[in-house]
Amino acid sequence: EPDGTLTVTDKRSMQVYRRLLTFEDCADIGDGWNFGPAANDQAIYSTGSRTTLALVSSGPNKATFRLRTVMEVPVEFHFERMTRSDDFSGMVIDSLVTLRAGAGWVEVDTTVHNDVRDHRLRVLFPSGAQAETCLMDSPFDVVERPVRLREDNHRYREQEVETRPQQTFTAVFDERRGLA
């Protein structure tokens, strides 16, 4: 898509997935272990950023494209003002998107050239699935975790956050739709 996102149609189920590969950047004022959201922070999305598309390789069995997105994000968080900097830097995000003949999936390998501080970058893959849990990789395991935070989360000293640790995949699905 012109905004740097992907639209994918699953030819087996004819389900269409839109706005895949949207990047979201927000302030992170936590420590090295825990994400700490900043009050009154405004998330920045890659859909408003400069994006270029280039064919990297093409053959009878696979094609690879490079999506390069340059997100203008604040260079740091000013703790004395409790706000993000007014100075911005271009964070380059390169995603190699590969399609293989006969494969039922799209491969994405993303590299981020990050020179900014005090922020969290995450990638969004809206599945449209009505799921209560998701599957994630963990060292030597696959674990099932709830999609939403507990209702009593606000009562705990160290509150859970919506994001969970994982390295290679997350899967979310219901009876009709799903992504991994």
What are these regions (language model features)?
Residues N114-V116:
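Short, acidic/polar linear motifs in exposed loop/turn regions
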Residues H119-L121:
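Active-site-proximal binding-pocket segments
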Residues F125-A180:
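Polysaccharide-binding surfaces and accessory modules of carbohydrate-active proteins
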